[in-house]
UniProtKB/Swiss-Prot annotation:
This is 5-epiaristolochene 1,3-dihydroxylase. CDD domains: CYP71-like (cd11072). Keywords: Heme, Iron, Membrane, Metal-binding, Monooxygenase, Oxidoreductase, Transmembrane, Transmembrane helix. Its EC number is 1.14.14.149. The lineage of its organism: Eukaryota, Viridiplantae, Streptophyta, Embryophyta, Tracheophyta. It comes from Nicotiana tabacum. PROSITE patterns: CYTOCHROME_P450. It is a single-pass membrane protein. Gene3D superfamilies: Cytochrome P450. It is found in: Membrane.
């Protein structure tokens, strides 16, 4: 972690002051949850060296318990790693833990957290979430994007056919990211962006910097460290590029609306049109601004693209590592649609085993392993311990999904485990929370899932997939690339042979 390279710069100057502050705060502290030993200034940060945060925190929780306190520099934090404690935070005391801490990366890219996902709890957040649920991502709107999804899936299939016909390995990761980006852009903007590659790259860059464990987040009052680390400069540069692209799109939409032209990909409203319409709604408590629109679009793009693309790649990687699962899933798709020229989202509802594959993928590889952090709004007692106001709270859903107390053979990829199991991912089962729970459950869940099922089914139907020559399933690397979301590290390169169904 980069902050260690900066410790020597400020250690001597601040040591005496912070040591005094540390002693004073400890003498006045309440009964915090147990946690690992701390040192002045850095707190518990030395324990975070040597692994991905969700891995390290899982291992620490085995020693210190399912409700664990850490001092991350200046930030008091609590990590939740059990079903019962997750229920306390996300249901019993949901409203108390409904706010968000400041994460510098998201503060910059989301226009002072004026979006939905990272906005602090309050009337503004309630208004923005209502707009999202009622106007942007309601069931009707998600269904209305089905023809865009079909069109983008056709383009995806054609691009892979082109790759395979030339004998090239298919960069499955790249193709899926492009599909998810195009799908989200056309839904939000009505078109594929001219600067889509740059836009997507910069959003992913920010997501990779938004873990909340960097120097700018753990030492928020030491502004000179923000400058020295270079982190803020990187974020601002990424933000400027994203802002310019979104600003151009909004201005183009305004011109088209003024001229009576349609912006939507299919002649109706796209998401920017909806937000521009609401900008003129005088009944809103908080008027919609250009920055609000930009922040929501960044939310949509980040969540819509990352959730569907990372989960699709993980699903295919796990099927390649577990050939029996791949064979069973592909056989189901081809048997279900063997007499059909084409199939759509309604048809995909029949694919029960494919749904189990997705659920198992989300169990082992939740899009956001620690969820988006919450912030405690007032002192709260849980399980005999006090969680002070302003404490950052992380729920390790990655660890919950791999806990042998809740899952047999927890580290193995076995979709069949869900066949006779009523556990779902809608926030009601606290051992399985890939989209969170409570009032801050991911509002774009239905949009993300809709962009998962159809493309994966079509890919299984149209191609026979194999690992590159010389790579055995057991050798496939499933190393994670850390960030606020966890993608698979490196591209997934596969052989794709077009399928020619026999017509009898």
């Amino acid at each position: 972690m980069q902050f260690f390279s900066l410790v020597s710069i400020f250690l001597f100057l601040s040591f005496l002051f912070l040591l005094r502050k540390w002693k004073n705060s400890n003498s006045q502290s309440k009964k915090l949850p147990p946690g690992p030993w701390k040192i002045p200034i850095l707190g518990s940060m030395l324990h975070m060296i040597g692994g991905e945060p969700h891995h390290v925190l899982r291992d620490l929780a085995k020693k210190y318990g399912p409700l664990m306190h850490l001092q991350l520099g200046e930030i008091s934090a609590v990590v939740v790693t059990s079903r019962d404690m997750a229920k306390e935070v996300l249901k019993t005391h949901d409203v108390v833990f409904a706010s968000r801490p400041k994460i510098v990366a998201m503060d910059i890219i989301c226009y002072n957290q004026s979006d939905i996902a990272f906005s602090p709890y309050g009337d503004h957040w309630r208004q923005m979430r209502k707009i999202c649920v009622m106007e942007l991502l309601n069931a009707k709107n998600v269904r209305s994007f089905s023809s865009i999804r079909r069109d983008e899936v056709v383009r995806l299939i054609d691009s892979i056919r082109s790759d395979s016909s030339s004998g090239e390995l298919v960069n499955f990761t790249q193709r899926i990211i492009w599909f998810a980006s195009s799908m989200t852009c056309r839904s939000a903007f009505g078109q594929v962006l001219k600067g889509q590659d740059i836009f997507a790259k910069k959003i992913r860059e920010v997501i990779g910097l938004a873990e909340g464990f960097d120097v700018v987040d753990i030492f928020p009052t030491y502004k000179f460290l923000h400058v020295l680390s270079g982190m803020k400069r990187k974020l601002l540069n990424a933000h400027l590029k994203v802002d310019a692209i979104v600003e151009d799109v909004i201005n183009e939409h305004k011109k088209n609306l003024a001229a009576g032209k349609s912006n939507g990909a299919l002649g109706g409203e796209d998401l920017i049109d909806v937000l521009l319409r609401l900008m003129n709604d005088t009944s809103l408590q908080f008027p919609i601004t250009n920055d609000n629109i930009k922040a929501v679009i960044v939310d949509m793009f980040a969540a819509g693209t990352e959730t569907s693309s990372t989960t699709t790649v993980w699903a295919m990687a796990e099927m390649m590592k577990n050939p029996s699962v791949f064979t069973k899933a592909q056989a189901e798709v081809r048997e279900a649609f063997r007499d059909k020229v084409s199939f759509d989202e309604n048809d995909v509802e029949e694919l029960k085993y494919l749904k189990l594959v997705i659920k198992e993928t989300l169990r082992l590889h939740p899009p956001s392993p620690l969820l988006v952090p919450r912030e405690c709004r007032e002192d709260t007692d849980i399980n005999g311990y006090t969680i002070p106001a302003k404490t950052k709270v992380m729920v390790n859903v990655w660890a919950l999904g791999r806990d042998p107390k809740y899952w047999d053979d927890a580290e193995s990829f076995k979709p069949e485990r869900f066949e006779q199991c009523s556990v779902d991912f809608f926030g009601n089962n606290f051992e399985f929370l890939p989209f969170g729970g409570g009032r801050r459950i991911c509002p774009g869940m239905s949009f993300g899932l809709a962009n998962l099922y159809l493309p994966l089914a079509q890919l299984l139907y149209h191609f026979d997939w194999k690992l590159p020559t010389g790579i055995m399933p057991r050798d496939l690397d499933l190393t994670e690339l850390s960030g606020i979301t966890i993608a698979r590290k490196g591209g997934l390169y596969l052989n794709a042979t077009p399928y020619q169904p026999s017509r009898e």
